[in-house]
């Protein structure tokens, strides 16, 4: 079945027909053909995508991506721990909110939504507060589309002996990285982002020695990261509670298609071409990005809304959807914006078609 429209969002996103077709079969969660032949293969493939080094493992966790973030924060940080969070968007703020809900002490570094965090501020906090045990940062902050400089921040955190948690929700699979080289202890992502699967579970790729320290630390039964991992390790891919079987099988297919495309490097190149084509086309129509070009990720881009008195996002959105494209409203607190994603089963030709559709949808310019 063909899609009625293209999702130009940061996830859920447009998937291939073959990924959707992979969900047409039912699976028994007790069978080896599911646990060993699908779940365990996924776990192995994820680690290989994340690093060339040994010592890392992976665990899949039911629910939205935020559930995996909460599982990590709630399991990795002990009763005496303290978290430093870099917050320059809604998703950094969400990590801090999770810590607050879980009664985990938290130091927040907030440079603002349109600025990259300042390394010296983080280093000062780490040097002055020995109670901090963990540092968390979002790689691609999809509030704006900003790509945060994780190398410098992870390096600073490791220099101070801290455990590093990376929210790579909207970057893993679409931006090359080696988490061992970066010094990342826990990396979190989701099925419905750059791997191009469908919603239903997230996953954590972790240094095994750090994950083993999480035993008996979880603040939630269903979000116990260690227990979920241990169950999968001992039972060859078995989940503790109901597994999202159809989503998992679709993700397995999506991983195969990532390999067929040429791996993360090739997908990154496609996403970059999409994003550059998008920005050039939007500028030709008079739209300006919220961020300077050097801050952009290849994942999603925020554009200032037109200042014309007749412009309304909902009307603009509806006209685009009628032409087969779905975009995202803005999420920046101090600027009127909208967002356009370019990940998923989206190619440069699709972006060129989008630019034509946007030109037709600019009703406020009609005389």
Curated annotation (Swiss-Prot):
Pfam families associated with the record: Aminotran_5
Position of the signal peptide: none
MF-aspect GO terms: 2-aminoethylphosphonate-pyruvate transaminase activity
Top-level EC class: transferase
Essential cofactor(s): pyridoxal 5'-phosphate
An annotated GO BP: organic phosphonate catabolic process
Swiss-Prot/TrEMBL catalytic activity: (2-aminoethyl)phosphonate + pyruvate = phosphonoacetaldehyde + L-alanine
Residue numbers carrying N6-(pyridoxal phosphate)lysine: 193
Protein's UniProt keywords contain Iron-sulfur: no
EC number, as in UniProt: 2.6.1.37
UniProt keyword Hydrolase, yes or no: no
Keyword annotations from UniProtKB, A to Z: Aminotransferase, Pyridoxal phosphate, Pyruvate, Transferase
Database matches in NCBIfam families: PhnW-AepZ, PRK13479.1, transamin_PhnW
Subunit relationships: Homodimer.
Biological role stated in the UniProt entry: Involved in phosphonate degradation.
Protein name (Swiss-Prot/TrEMBL): 2-aminoethylphosphonate--pyruvate transaminase
């Amino acid at each position: 079945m063909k899609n009625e429209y293209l999702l130009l969002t940061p996830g859920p996103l447009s998937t291939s027909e073959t990924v959707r077709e992979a969900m047409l079969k039912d699976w028994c969660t007790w069978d080896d053909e599911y646990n060993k032949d699908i779940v365990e293969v996924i776990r192995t493939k994820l680690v290989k995508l994340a690093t060339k080094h040994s010592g890392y493992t992976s665990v899949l966790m039911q629910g939205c991506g935020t559930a995996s973030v909460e599982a990590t924060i709630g399991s990795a940080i002990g009763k005496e721990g303290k978290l430093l969070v870099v917050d320059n968007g809604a998703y950094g703020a969400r990590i801090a909110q999770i810590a607050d809900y879980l009664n985990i002490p938290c130091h927040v570094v907030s440079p603002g939504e349109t600025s990259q965090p300042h390394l010296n501020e983080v280093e000062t906090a780490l040097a002055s507060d020995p109670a901090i045990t963990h540092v968390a940062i979002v790689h691609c902050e999809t509030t704006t589309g900003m790509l945060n400089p994780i190398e410098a921040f992870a390096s600073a955190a490791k220099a101070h002996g801290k455990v590093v948690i990376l929210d790579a929700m909207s970057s893993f699979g679409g931006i090359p990285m080696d988490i061992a080289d970066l010094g990342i202890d826990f990396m979190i992502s989701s099925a419905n982002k750059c791997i191009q699967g469908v919603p239903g579970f997230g996953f954590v790729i972790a240094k095994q020695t750090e994950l083993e320290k999480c035993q008996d630390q979880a603040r939630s039964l269903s979000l116990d990261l260690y227990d979920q991992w241990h169950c999968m390790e001992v039972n060859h891919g078995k989940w503790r509670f109901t597994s999202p079987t159809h989503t998992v099988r679709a993700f397995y297919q999506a991983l195969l298609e990532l390999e067929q495309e040429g791996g993360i490097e090739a997908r990154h190149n496609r996403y970059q071409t999409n994003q550059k084509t998008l920005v050039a086309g939007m500028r030709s129509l008079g739209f300006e990005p919220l961020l300077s070009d050097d801050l952009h990720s290849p994942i999603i881009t925020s554009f200032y809304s037109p200042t014309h008195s007749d412009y309304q996002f909902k009307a603009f959105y509806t006209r685009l959807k009628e032409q087969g494209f779905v975009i995202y409203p803005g999420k920046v607190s101090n600027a009127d914006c909208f967002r356009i994603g370019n990940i998923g089963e989206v190619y440069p030709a699709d972006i060129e078609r989008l630019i034509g559709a946007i030109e037709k949808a600019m009703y406020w310019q009609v005389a």
